[in-house]
Every structure is written in C-alpha cells, then in structure tokens.
C-alpha cells in the first residue's frame, strides 16, 4: 500500500515539475505577428531575423535566390518599358525602341529565372537610355519594385559567371507572400515564433486564426508609399490603406492587451522621395516643411492618433530600413526589451 502511494506521489511530483517547466517555457515563448499592407517590408524583416538570430544564408541558399533576382530584374525593366508607352515618354535613342520590342519577345520565350547574355546586354543598354531614366523617375505613377534601381544599375555584377548573391542582394529580392510563414529563433532567453502574413487584400482573411495568444504585433507601414496606389486597386492610395488597416488592428478587441509596435519602414526611400514629391499628395491638410523629419513625424502622428485607447495603451514606433541589418538589429533589440518589460508587468514583477 505504502509503496503504491509513494509511486503515485513520485508520479505526481514529476507531473508537477513537467507542468512547471511547460509554464516557464510558455512564459518565455513570444508569439510575434508581422502585419501590414502588401509590399511594406514584412518579409525583409523575416530575412533579417535569419541573418541576425539564426546563422544567415548558406551558399546553397544564396544560390537559390539567383532565379528570383533575375526574375525581379526582368520584371522591373519590363514595367518601365510598358510605362514608357502609358506615360508617353520618348526613348533618348530611337534604337532602344527595337531593344524594347526584342526584350518583350525574349521575356515570353526564355526559361523563367534565367538571364541569357543577349538579354542582359539589351537590359543594360535600355537602363542607360535617358528616356528610360526619365520614366524610372516617375515610378510612383505605375507599379515598380523598390529594388529596381538597385539591381538594374548593378546588372553587370549580377550576370558575371560564378555570381553568388550577397546578403544585400537576397534582402532586396521580392516574392509575394501567400499564406503564413513561421520563423523560430531565440534571443535574450526568449523563444520567438514570428509569423509573416501576406499583406495584399486577398491574403488578409488568413490572418484571423493567428490571433490567438499573440504577445506582440509588429505593424509595418512603408513611409515611401505616400504617393503610390495599391497593386490590387489603383484607386486607393497605399498610405491611406495602411492607416485604415492599422486602425482596424490597433483598436481590435482581440488586441486590447497585446503590445503593438509600429515600424515606419523604407525610411531610405522616403528620404529621397520627399525631396521631390510633397506630402500633401497624400495628406492635403499638410502644410509643414517638406523635410524628412517634419513629414516623417507627421506620418507617425497620423498612425498614433488612431489609437483610441492611448490613455492606457502605448504604441511604440520606430523609423526603420528593413534592408539595413544594423538598423533592424538595433530596433529589434529595443522591441525585445519592450516585450520583456510588458511581460514582467503582466506577471506583476515590474
């Protein structure tokens, strides 16, 4: 009888120990949700987590990006060529018209993700054309990848035999996120589970079941989107869409107790763009100076003022450049400290 009882006690103690360990593990598990409109930079943040908190990209993984990079480069020059017609811009050299026609034809016939020499030569000639450059300067009037200039101006390096993509090449590459991508890593004694969710409208209905037990939401908005329209709807300004989405998330009853951090991303693109395009394009009431600081701060205030519970709930915001590893490392470190502080506060230890 006694032996049976002590075995039961032992089993009970083991179970208690296991439950305690599980509870501690749960307390140290951080569920992070990356939300934001399409092309705001969510997937680039995920790539940075791999670089900063995992072991980065192996040679094999880098090589897998070549096809994506070539595909992005081709799509970018094709978008510019098509816009030449729509915007009625003349080529600086009329011979480029033939190059453009040849390129359109080749794009339909080559194997996807490859870059034959004849094609890269044509692309390089087109990119140097003054008409193409004038069209590139008007990129906000049509849909063009942010990485267009980065790849097109460096195409010679990208097509060198034996080319291996650099971390920056990988970070700049773009594949539309469909569905939900989970990344796991450890940092500051916490186990992170980060979920990247497709941002375009058709993808958003998949978010809802991710909402259970979220520790922190990182909402990403592209600062540079103030003069752009949606891929899905060319009547809707991207910044307005982003504000609308942020409003519905930060005031959602699901997230009443969830920490929310706002990344105002693409500050590098924004700092160049604001020199040329006035913020009043997006916010007609804005009559402040058209500088990076003033315009950037005005955008930040537009987001933060949407928080209906700002008397009790603080939303932390950061200006970010998702392709800059040091910047992301610094900001994510600050976010982690916020998460630790908020979690300790919840446990009554802070």
UniProtKB/Swiss-Prot annotation:
Mg(2+) binds at residues 43, 177. Keywords: Cell projection, GTP-binding, Lipoprotein, Magnesium, Membrane, Metal-binding, Myristate, Nucleotide-binding, Phosphoprotein, Sensory transduction, Transducer, Vision. SUPFAM superfamilies: P-loop containing nucleoside triphosphate hydrolases, Transducin (alpha subunit), insertion domain. The modification Phosphotyrosine is found at residue 142. It is found in: Cell projection, Cilium, Photoreceptor outer segment; Membrane; Photoreceptor inner segment. A lipid is attached at residue 2 (N-myristoyl glycine). The keyword Lipoprotein applies. Residues 7-21 have a biased composition (Basic and acidic residues). Changing residue 43 to N: Facilitated GDP-GTP exchange, increasing the levels of the activated GTP-bound form. This is Guanine nucleotide-binding protein G(t) subunit alpha-1. The gene is GNAT1.
